[in-house]
Curated annotation (Swiss-Prot):
DNA-binding region: 395-454
Taxon lineage: Eukaryota, Metazoa, Chordata, Craniata, Vertebrata
Protein name according to UniProt: POU domain, class 2, transcription factor 1
GO biological process: Notch signaling pathway; positive regulation of DNA-templated transcription; positive regulation of transcription by RNA polymerase II; radial glial cell differentiation; regulation of apoptotic process; regulation of transcription by RNA polymerase II
InterPro entries recorded: HD (IPR001356), Homeobox_CS (IPR017970), Homeodomain-like_sf (IPR009057), Lambda_DNA-bd_dom_sf (IPR010982), POU (IPR013847), POU2F1_C (IPR045703), POU_dom (IPR000327), POU_domain_TF (IPR050255)
Gene Ontology molecular functions: DNA-binding transcription factor activity, RNA polymerase II-specific; RNA polymerase II cis-regulatory region sequence-specific DNA binding; sequence-specific DNA binding
Length: 758
């Protein structure tokens, strides 16, 4: 299609002619005899665009023409209408040629094969039609539907006369239906279009002329609204906005057809009405004025409203989040606090601010009406539904103030129980007439405060002090629960420093048993106990004032045990009666012994076991030993190498019997205080050939007076005497017991101390 400009206004939009092919008929439109094959366009300066339009098949075109051939109107009326509209088209038809897209840059060789259509302004301006292919296809389908409807409606009319269907789609301005006989004043239209340009309104209207042999003047008026235009109007209101004079021209028996596209595309309403036979004597009406659009709110007005809204909102006592929640309950649209904040800061888009402004105005008026007659603290107003005042209840509660007398009562309850149960908290709250949640929070905070004041430490002192026993040649006082320092001998202070784990074993500590005078030989005291005290005071192992102490410090993860080593120069040489302590394998041997002792019946006693072993039952009264007690020893030699077969059995009774029968465990007497005495009988070389182990789990039987093993019976003996004192009431393992081995010459004045490890 070759386009010529017959005016000084530049062409910017091109719309191809939908060609309806009929192989049997080829003719020209009567309106094309004036030789003007150009297109007259009057409009604004818009960007030139090519519009792709999908093609229709030949079968569809023939079916459409078949219906159009049945429509006939008066030729003179159509000619008068065509001349009044200044629509001049020239149509050259070629059979089987599909609809094509025409661009201004086409070569002249294509001009003969392209239908020529004259486009002109109809109440508006021809501008660039920016349609997607889907929208263009829909537009063609709608045009075909209107042609078919017009053909069916005029099937009873005269044939060989073409009918026109006026299709008007407007989403920007309510356009008035224009009768075909009304001329259009282009100059006045241009003036209106200039006004519209100042308002930034892109009004696009097109007149599509599809002349065929039998359809001499089929005219289509199409108005398309650009996407993104603010002033969109509802499509269903289009027909109601048509003037009465245009409605009078419609056939009473032929309803309009309204087709609305999907929401994804711009709204279009197409009303198909047949063109009436216009009498030639009809007078030319006046120019139709295009109604002006409502101007959207400008930026200054929005800025002023946002500022006013923020001030009034703060004055009413609402937060931005309260406004969003209230609007969601009132109008069904939930708005976040960020949205309200951006509106007040003018950070939203112009479109969104225009949408949000009326909602905020309505909410502000409702909020002011509610608070005008009542205060914000009126609960009836706060709880009334539908007023959007629920946001006030979301405010942070004030800090709870607790009176002094209640605080004192809570402190007293905290000292009694730092972590009460839910029932106890409820009881306290009822007594103090306070809320349960307040009491619960107070206890939580008080416990945290206690942790800050008295932080728990791994090296802290235990609640139970060391219970050391001091024995002397005088009658033994065994019930002293604290450190005994009443000995006239020189005291020795040893710091607990060496950590021991449960798997650690003390290496061999030997007291050489060689004869002869030697000052290098020392008596060794080995003790393992939990760090229940930082300083342990124990009596000296001899009367010598020159006592020395060797201590070392080390620390492990969270737990510290104690190893005490006291060395005292010996005043005389060691005899064969002295004790050699070999502690290698002490943990394994103790565990084996305890395993056998744990399987004893609960009603067993040391008296019964001693009687069964052949010992004199008169030495041990049953009342002095609790049920389940166990007493056993080891054979001479290293603890881990020369164990007796009887010890390996599960019967402690057999162990005691074997030890007693072999003479390695002589029990000589039992003093009046309940102390079991092991002493040297005559010149026996070895009194106790190995360390004596008392089961720590069962030594709790000595609750009143812990057992003290001393050699008081041989106070006047001439030979060397060795005493063994091993008492403990540990509850965990033999490693936490205190083993003391001592040796001296002369009178039996050697004393030892033991600890009670909790």
């Amino acid at each position: 299609m070759k386009l010529h400009s017959s005016s000084k206004i530049q062409n910017h939009a091109w719309l191809s002619d939908a060609r309806m092919n009929n192989p049997s008929e080829t003719s020209k439109s009567p309106e094309s005899g004036d030789g003007n094959t150009g297109t007259q366009t009057n409009g604004l300066d818009f960007q030139k665009q090519a519009v792709p339009i999908g093609a229709i098949t030949s079968a569809q075109a023939q079916a459409l023409l078949g219906h159009l051939h049945q429509v006939q109107l008066a030729g003179t009326s159509l000619q008068a209408a065509a001349h009044s509209l200044n629509v001049q088209t020239k149509f050259k038809e070629e059979p089987g040629e599909p609809m094509q897209v025409v661009q201004p840059s086409q070569q002249p060789s294509l001009q003969a094969a392209i239908p020529q259509t004259q486009l002109m302004v109809a109440g508006g301006q021809i501008a660039g039609l920016t349609l997607t292919p889907a929208q263009q296809q829909m537009l063609l389908q709608q045009a075909q539907a209107q042609l078919l409807a017009a053909a069916v409606q005029h099937s009873a009319s005269q044939q060989h006369n073409a009918a026109g269907a006026t299709i008007s789609a407007s989403a920007a301005t309510p356009m008035t239906q224009i009768p075909l006989s009304q001329p259009i004043q282009i100059a006045q239209d241009l003036q209106q279009l200039q006004q519209l340009q100042q308002q930034n309104l892109n009004l696009q209207q097109y007149v599509l002329v599809h002349p065929t042999t039998n359809l001499q003047s089929a005219q289509f008026i199409i108005s398309q609204t650009p996407q993104g235009q603010q002033g969109l109007l509802q499509a269903q209101n289009l027909l109601t906005q048509l003037p009465q004079q245009s409605q009078a021209n419609l056939l009473q028996s032929q309803p309009s057809i309204t087709l609305t596209s999907q929401p994804a595309t711009p709204t279009r309403t197409i009303a198909a009405t047949p063109v009436q036979q216009l009498p030639q004597s009809q007078t030319t009406p006046k120019r139709i004025d295009t109604p002006s659009l409502e101007e959207p709110s400008d930026l200054e007005e929005l800025e002023q409203f946002a500022k006013t809204f923020k001030q009034r909102r703060i004055k009413l006592g609402f937060t931005q989040g309260d406004v969003g929640l209230a609007m969601g309950k009132l109008y069904g649209n939930d708005f976040s606090q960020t949205t309200i904040s951006r509106f007040e800061a003018l950070n939203l888009s112009f479109k969104n601010m225009c949408k949000l402004k009326p909602l905020l105005e309505k909410w502000l008026n409702d909020a002011e009406n509610i608070t005008s007659d009542s205060t914000l603290t009126n609960q009836s107003v706060l709880n009334s539904p539908g007023h959007g005042m629920e946001g006030l209840n979301r405010r942070r509660k004030k800090r709870t103030s607790i009176e002094t007398n209640i605080r004192v009562a809570l402190e007293k309850s905290f000292l009694e129980n730092q972590k009460p149960t839910s029932e106890e908290i409820t009881m306290i709250a009822d007594q103090l007439n306070m809320e349960k949640e307040v009491i619960r929070v107070w206890f939580c905070n008080r416990r945290q405060k206690e942790k800050r004041i008295n932080p728990p430490s791994s090296g802290g002192s235990s609640s139970s002090p060391i219970k050391s026993l001091f024995s002397s040649p005088n009658p033994l006082v065994a019930s002293t629960p604290s450190l005994v320092t009443s000995s006239p001998a020189t005291t020795l202070t040893v710091n607990p420093v060496l950590p021991l784990t449960s798997a650690a074993a003390i290496t061999s500590f030997h007291i050489p048993g060689t004869t002869g005078t030697s000052s290098a030989n020392t008596a060794t005291v080995i003790s393992t106990a939990p760090p229940v005290s930082s300083v342990l005071t124990s009596p000296s192992l001899s009367s010598s004032p020159s006592a020395t102490a060797a201590s070392s410090e080390a620390s492990t993860a969270g737990e510290t045990s104690t190893t005490q080593t006291t060395s005292t120069p010996m005043t005389s040489s060691l005899n064969t009666g002295q004790v050699m302590v070999t502690a290698s394998g002490i943990h394994t041997a103790a565990a084996t012994a305890l395993q056998g002792a744990a399987q004893l019946p609960t009603n067993a006693s040391l008296a019964a076991m001693a009687a069964a072993a052949g010992l004199n039952p008169g030495l041990m009264a049953p009342s002095q030993f609790a049920a389940g007690g166990a007493l056993f020893s080891l054979n001479p030699g290293a603890l881990g190498s020369a164990l007796s077969p009887a010890l390996m059995s599960n019967s402690t009774l057999a162990t005691i019997q074997a030890l007693a029968s072999s003479g390695s465990l002589p029990i000589t007497s039992l003093d009046a205080a309940g102390n079991l005495v092991f002493a040297n009988a005559g010149g026996t070389p070895n009194i106790v050939t190995a360390p004596l182990f008392l089961n720590p789990q069962n030594l709790s039987l000595f609750t009143s007076n812990p057992v003290s093993l001393i050699s008081a019976a041989s106070a006047g003996a001439t030979g060397p005497i060795t005493s063994l004192h091993a008492t403990t009431s540990s509850i965990d393992s033999i490693q936490n017991a205190l083993f003391t081995m001592a040796s001296a010459s002369g009178a039996a004045s050697t004393t030892t101390s033991a600890s009670k490890a909790q």
